[in-house]
Structure formats: structure tokens, C-alpha cells
Amino acid sequence: MKTVFNRKDIDFSKEPMFFGEDNSVQRYDVFKYPVFDKLNQKMIGYFWRPEEVSLQKDRGDYAEFRPEQKHIFTSNLKYQTLLDSVQGRGPSLAFLPYVSSPELEGCIVTWDFFETIHSRSYTHIMKNVYADPSEVFDTILNDKEILKLSLIHI
């Protein structure tokens, strides 16, 4: 049975990447797979917050769009929001139950976190461009074209 903390003293440098002992103390000083720690550090270096970006110009630009441009812009936001809603939780749900490498576990959690930032960035755009972002959010799951396109990737 999977546990969130294994009390055994385990040498994870001798464990397989998947299907080994459940993880215990998160150690980031000794690695069997150092590439995952390097990837994790690289991802952390790209940290940003969507709110740091002013969208005042974008709001004005959107107001000047023709109807077909607004449709393309909004459809893209719907599509990206749907995909990153999956990607923001997918890697952890799919892989963490089977991971036995602390460095890979950390890399997957960071990956999920950054996908969530992407998703939050689409919310930030919608809150700044549309008078009522709910009008966009509430139509994502009713948009047959967006759903059809997303099924290719989900």
C-alpha cells in the first residue's frame, strides 16, 4: 500500500526510478538520477507570476479586434485553459503513485506547479481582457470544437 512517508531507512541510490520502495525523507544531496535535479533547478529558475505582466494594452487591442479575431483569440484561451487544467494535475496523478526516486518526485511536482502557473496566466488574461471572464469560462465545456480538438491531446 502506498504511503506518503515511508519510515524505513532506504538508500534511494539503489532503488529503481519506478515501483521501488515508497519515498521517505526527501534528500536532494545524493542522486541516482542527477538529470532530474538539474531539470528541477532549471524549471525553478523560470519562476514567474502572471500578475507581474500588465495587460492594459492587450485589453485595448482586444477591444479593436474584428469579430473573427475575437473568436480566434477567445477560442485559443479556452483551448489552452482546458489543456492546462489537465496538465496542471496530470503528471502528479499519473506518475507520483509509482515514483520511487526523490529527485524525479521533486521534478514532477515542480512540473505540475508550472503547468498550474500557465493555467493561472490564462485566468489573468481573461480577467483583464473580458468584462466578465465567466462568460468565457462557463462556455469551455460546451464548445464542441474545443472539446473535439482537446480530445486529440487528452
What are these regions (language model features)?
Residues K38-Q41, G45-Y46, S75, Y79, ...:
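Charged/polar, solvent-exposed surface patches and flexible loops
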Residues V35-K38, M43, D61, I72, ...:
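Exposed alpha-helical structural elements
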Residues V109-L141:
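Carboxylate/His-rich catalytic cores and anion/metal-binding grooves
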Residues M1-Q56, A63-F65, Q69, S100-G106:
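Extreme N-terminal leader/anchor segments
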Residues I140-S150:
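Long, K/E/R/D-enriched contiguous segments that form extended
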Residues I152-I154:
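Conserved small/polar residues in nucleotide/adenosyl-binding loops
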Residues S54-T110, F114:
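Long, hydrophobic/aromatic-enriched structural stretches that serve as scaffold segments
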